[in-house]
């Protein structure tokens, strides 16, 4: 090993401010990951719907019970909100809008919440079978948890959203 020490050596920064550049890259990645999360949530909803239509209890499909309908409807609402916010992020990304940080954080937060919610509800609708390895519910749950931590926690993205809105004097 060698150690090099510079003392009173002239230095010149290369490139732009590193932190701003890193946040811009994370904003771009957040928009792309949001679409992956929306896609995963859609599959979880479809799996839950198909199972609810096929599974019968007390002589009728469990999809006919109001509690199951409400769960499926709640999943659908969260997914559509996440999709809309992801499109907003994609729009901001496509034109390099000044509001990219707001759009990316909005897409990230809503898509993470939608995917986590849909993957959990999918397991619940599958009942005991949702906890087994026979169905792929666990794969979507684990992927939702992994993507929730990619690029930072949900708390961090919510804080970024608040800071971005404060900078715009919206909050």
Residue ranges and their predicted role:
Residues 1-13, 21:
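Flexible, small-/acidic-enriched active-site or ligand-binding loops
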């Amino acid at each position: 090993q060698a150690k090099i020490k510079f003392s009173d050596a002239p230095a010149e920064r290369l490139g732009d401010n590193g932190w701003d550049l890193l946040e811009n890259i994370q904003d771009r990645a957040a928009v792309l990951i949001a679409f992956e999360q929306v896609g995963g949530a859609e599959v979880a909803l479809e799996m839950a719907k198909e199972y609810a239509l096929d599974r019968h209890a007390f002589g009728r499909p469990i999809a006919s019970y109001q509690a199951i309908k409400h769960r499926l409807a709640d999943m659908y609402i969260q997914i559509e909100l996440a999709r809309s916010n992801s499109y907003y992020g994609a729009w901001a990304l496509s034109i390099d809008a000044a509001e990219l940080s707001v759009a990316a954080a909005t897409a990230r937060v809503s898509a993470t919440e939608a995917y986590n919610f849909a993957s959990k509800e999918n397991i619940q609708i599958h009942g005991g079978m949702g906890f087994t390895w026979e169905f792929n519910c666990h794969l979507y749950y684990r992927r939702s948890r992994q993507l929730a931590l990619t690029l930072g926690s949900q708390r961090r993205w919510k804080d970024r959203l608040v800071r971005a809105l404060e900078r715009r004097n919206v909050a």
